[in-house]
Amino acid sequence: MEIGLKNGEKLNLEVTSLLLEYVEDYKGGVNQLLKDAQGEKNENGYTRSMYATNQLLYAVIASNYDKPLTYRQAVRLVKLEDISRILNFIAENIPDEILEQQNFNHRI
């Protein structure tokens, strides 16, 4: 999927191992991140949807951009109208095997 960034550049989005590495760091793993992004309430009755959404945006933009980006830079490059498209892209393209694992258990 291709999106246009606020700086005028076009970015082709792909699910890569780098993207999976970024989302792996989220407390609860990718499943919790996707739940939080969808607005599910936590044990205290609060949602973390904006935080989770920005974490996903950072992961996908930073992993597909050619230059290193900070969290803030990556999130600010995304147009508001592209947020739901990006979230849908991630949800549809992360392999089911990864979603079934609560945490990614890498073997050395």
Residue ranges and their predicted role:
Residues 1-10, 20, 25-45, 63-108:
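Charged interaction scaffolds used for protein-protein
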